[in-house]
C-alpha cells in the first residue's frame, strides 16, 4: 500500500456516527475533503460504493458540494478532468468496483500526461473476497500503472483510530493530487452491510466550510522556484520562444522581456502579445528564419507541428525546456540541454537594432501570411465615395459572402470572433484544432484541449466539466459560455456524454461539430500517399452518416445546422435554454 504522508488527522468533533463502518468511513472521508475545499464531486451509481454515494447525496442536499451524477464512468472521468483543468483542483470521482474503475483509465492517462489533478475514490471488496472470482471483482490497486499514486484502504472497523486514518488518507490524497497536479487513486474496501441511512449533515458541513475558509485565509502564498532552479538567459543567440499546450502566460512574458519571437500554439495560454508569430510552421521551413535559430526555449507540451520537435532536435540549436506540464519531460531526440523550473532574461542585447530586426522579421512575415490567407475569405469592404452602381455591386457581393459555404478556416475564425475573454473554448483532436492553430490571430482567450495524449475520447465531457467549473464562480467567467469545437468522429466517440440526467446542472455550452463525414485528418498524413483510396476509406476515414439532428433531440439538446457564413454567425450567437449542438457541414 502506498500512502501519501503522515500529517495528523483532524476529525470533526461534530462528525456524526451511525455505527455502520461503511457509512462512517464515507462520512469521515468526504467531510475531510469538504474541509479541504472540495466543491464538486462526480459520481457513478454502484453497489460497492453506495456509502460514498449516499453521503455525497446528503452533502449536496445541504449545499456541501455540487454533485454531478453520470451513468458512464468514462464520461465521468473526463468530466472530473474538465473540472480539474479549469479550477486547478481535483474533483473527486466516485465509482463502484470492476470495469467501472477500468473505464476511468483514459481520463487518468490524459490527466497524468497533462498534469491535471484528479482524485479517484473507487469502491472495492474486502481482502477476503479478492482473488477468488467474486462477482465484479478484479485487482484494482495498480490498475493504472506504477506512475499513478495508489492508496489501497482495507475494509473499515468501527474505531476512532480507523476513522481518523480514513480522514487523514482522504486529506493527504487530495493535497497530493492538487499540489503535484497528478491523478491519485484511493481504492476503498467496504464490507457488508454496505450502508445505512445518512444523518443530517448541515451542522457538519457548516463546520467543514468554516475550516476550509480559515485554512484558505491562513495559507501562505505559493512558493516560487528557488534561485537554484532559475536559469539566467543572456541575450546573444538568435532565440525563438515556443509555447506548447498548457504553457501558460510565462512564455509570452519571457518573449516580451527578451524581445524574442513567440511561436505559441492555440491552446498554450500564450497565444497573444506583440511578439506572437502565428505562421511559425511556414517560417520554420523558410530560408532565413528556421535555419537561423540558435536557441529555442520551450514552455508547455508542443503537439501540433512536426517542425518544432525537428527544431528542438537539431544539433546546432541550444534547446531549453522550462518546467513540466505532465508526467514526462519534453525532450525530442534527447537533445535538450537544460530543463530549469523557470528562466529569466539578464543583461541587454549587444546590438539592440539587430535584436529588433530578428523579432520584427518574424512578426511581419507571419502577419503577411495571415493577411494573404484572410483576404481570400474576407467579406468585401465598401470604399468611400462610391457610385450607386458600385454600391449595388457591393450589396450583391456582401450577400454572396453571407450565403457562402462554411470552410474549415472560416469556421475557426467565426468561432474565435464570437468568443470573449470570459468565455471558454475547448478544441477537440481533429483537423480543426490544427486549422485554428494556423489561422487565428492573437487573443487573450482561455483555450483548453486534451493534448496530453491528444486522443479524441472524452472531449464533450471534458468541455462540460470546464463549463460547470467556469460558470460556478463569482468572476466574469460565470457569465460566459463554453464552446466545444469537434469533428464528427470526436463527437460520436463521446456521444454518451451528451446524456445529462434529470436534475443535473446544465451549463451554458455549445458543441460545434465540423461534419465532413469521417476522419479526414488521415487525408493529410503519409498513409494517403501509400494506401489505396478504398482501403483508406474503409479503415482510416471510417465514413459515417449519423443524423445529428435526431441524435441531439434524443439527448435533449437543441440542434442547429449552419452551412453558410450567415447561418453560422446566427447559430453562434443563439441564446438557448438547452445545451446547443451546431452542425456545420464541411467538404472532405
Curated annotation (Swiss-Prot):
The keyword Glycoprotein does not apply. It catalyses: isochorismate + 2-oxoglutarate + H(+) = 5-enolpyruvoyl-6-hydroxy-2-succinyl-cyclohex-3-ene-1-carboxylate + CO2. Its cofactor is Mg(2+); Mn(2+); thiamine diphosphate. Residues 1-22 are annotated as: Disordered. Binds 1 thiamine pyrophosphate per subunit. One of its GO terms (molecular function) is thiamine pyrophosphate binding. Keywords: Magnesium, Manganese, Menaquinone biosynthesis, Metal-binding, Thiamine pyrophosphate, Transferase. Pathway: Quinol/quinone metabolism; 1,4-dihydroxy-2-naphthoate biosynthesis; 1,4-dihydroxy-2-naphthoate from chorismate: step 2/7; Quinol/quinone metabolism; menaquinone biosynthesis. Disulfide bonds: none annotated. CDD domains: TPP_PYR_MenD, TPP_SHCHC_synthase. Belongs to the TPP enzyme family. MenD subfamily. Homodimer. PANTHER family: 2-SUCCINYL-5-ENOLPYRUVYL-6-HYDROXY-3-CYCLOHEXENE-1-CARBOXYLATE SYNTHASE, PROTEIN PHYLLO, CHLOROPLASTIC. This is 2-succinyl-5-enolpyruvyl-6-hydroxy-3-cyclohexene-1-carboxylate synthase. It comes from Clavibacter michiganensis subsp. michiganensis (strain NCPPB 382).
Amino acid at each position: 500500500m502506498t500512502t501519501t504522508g503522515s500529517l495528523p488527522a483532524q476529525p470533526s468533533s461534530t462528525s456524526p456516527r451511525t455505527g455502520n463502518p461503511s457509512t462512517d468511513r464515507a462520512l469521515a472521508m468526504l467531510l475531510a475533503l469538504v474541509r479541504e475545499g472540495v466543491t464538486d464531486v462526480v459520481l457513478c451509481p454502484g453497489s460497492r460504493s453506495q456509502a460514498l454515494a449516499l453521503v455525497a447525496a446528503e452533502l449536496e442536499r445541504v449545499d456541501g458540494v455540487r454533485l454531478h451524477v453520470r451513468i458512464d464512468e468514462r464520461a465521468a472521468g473526463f468530466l472530473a478532468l474538465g473540472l480539474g483543468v479549469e479550477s486547478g483542483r481535483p474533483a473527486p470521482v466516485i465509482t463502484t468496483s470492476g470495469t467501472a474503475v477500468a473505464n476511468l483509465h483514459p481520463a487518468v492517462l490524459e490527466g497524468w500526461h497533462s498534469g491535471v489533478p484528479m482524485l479517484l475514490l473507487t469502491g472495492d471488496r474486502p481482502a477476503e473476497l479478492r482473488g477468488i472470482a467474486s462477482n465484479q471483482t478484479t485487482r484494482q490497486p495498480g490498475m493504472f500503472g506504477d506512475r499513478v499514486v495508489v492508496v489501497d484502504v482495507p475494509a473499515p472497523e468501527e474505531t476512532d483510530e480507523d476513522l481518523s486514518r480514513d480522514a487523514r488518507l482522504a486529506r493527504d490524497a487530495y493535497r497530493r493530487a492538487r499540489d503535484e497536479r497528478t491523478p491519485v487513486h484511493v481504492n476503498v474496501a467496504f464490507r457488508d452491510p454496505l450502508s445505512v441511512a445518512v444523518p443530517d449533515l448541515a451542522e457538519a458541513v457548516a463546520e467543514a466550510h468554516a475550516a476550509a475558509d480559515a485554512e484558505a485565509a491562513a495559507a501562505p502564498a505559493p512558493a516560487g522556484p528557488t534561485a537554484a532552479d532559475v536559469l539566467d538567459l543572456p541575450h546573444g543567440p538568435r532565440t525563438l520562444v515556443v509555447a506548447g499546450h498548457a504553457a501558460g502566460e510565462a512564455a509570452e512574458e519571457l518573449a516580451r522581456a527578451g524581445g524574442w519571437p513567440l511561436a505559441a500554439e492555440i491552446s498554450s495560454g500564450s497565444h497573444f502579445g506583440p511578439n506572437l508569430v502565428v505562421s511559425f510552421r511556414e517560417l520554420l521551413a523558410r530560408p532565413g528564419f528556421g535555419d537561423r535559430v540558435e536557441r529555442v526555449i520551450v514552455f508547455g507540451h508542443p503537439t501540433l507541428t512536426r517542425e518544432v520537435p525537428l527544431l528542438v532536435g537539431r544539433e546546432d540549436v541550444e534547446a531549453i525546456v522550462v518546467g513540466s506540464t505532465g508526467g514526462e519531460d519534453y525532450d525530442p531526440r534527447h537533445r535538450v540541454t537544460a530543463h530549469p523550473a523557470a528562466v529569466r532574461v539578464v543583461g541587454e542585447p549587444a546590438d539592440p537594432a539587430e535584436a529588433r530586426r530578428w523579432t520584427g522579421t518574424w512578426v511581419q512575415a507571419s502577419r503577411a501570411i495571415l493577411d494573404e490567407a484572410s483576404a481570400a475569405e474576407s467579406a468585401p469592404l465598401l470604399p468611400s465615395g462610391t457610385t450607386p452602381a458600385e454600391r449595388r455591386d457591393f450589396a450583391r457581393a456582401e450577400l454572396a459572402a453571407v450565403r457562402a459555404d462554411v470552410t474549415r478556416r472560416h469556421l475557426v475564425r467565426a468561432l474565435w470572433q464570437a468568443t470573449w475573454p470570459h468565455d471558454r473554448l475547448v478544441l477537440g483532436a481533429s483537423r480543426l484544432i490544427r486549422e485554428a492553430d494556423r489561422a487565428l490571430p492573437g487573443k487573450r482567450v482561455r483555450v483548453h484541449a486534451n493534448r496530453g495524449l491528444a486522443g479524441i475520447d472524452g472531449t464533450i465531457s471534458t468541455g462540460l466539466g470546464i463549463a460547470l467549473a467556469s460558470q460556478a464562480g463569482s468572476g466574469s467567467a460565470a457569465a460566459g459560455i463554453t464552446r466545444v469545437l469537434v469533428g464528427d468522429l470526436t463527437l460520436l466517440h463521446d456521444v454518451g456524454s451528451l446524456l445529462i440526467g434529470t436534475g443535473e446542472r446544465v451549463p451554458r455550452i455549445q458543441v460545434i461539430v465540423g461534419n465532413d463525414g469521417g476522419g479526414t485528418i488521415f487525408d493529410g498524413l503519409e498513409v494517403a500517399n501509400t494506401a489505396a483510396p478504398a482501403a483508406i476509406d474503409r479503415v482510416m476515414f471510417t465514413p459515417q452518416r449519423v443524423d445529428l439532428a435526431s441524435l441531439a433531440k434524443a439527448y435533449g439538446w437543441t440542434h442547429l445546422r449552419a452551412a453558410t457564413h450567415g447561418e453560422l454567425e446566427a447559430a453562434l450567437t443563439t441564446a438557448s435554454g438547452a445545451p446547443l449542438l451546431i452542425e456545420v457541414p464541411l467538404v472532405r
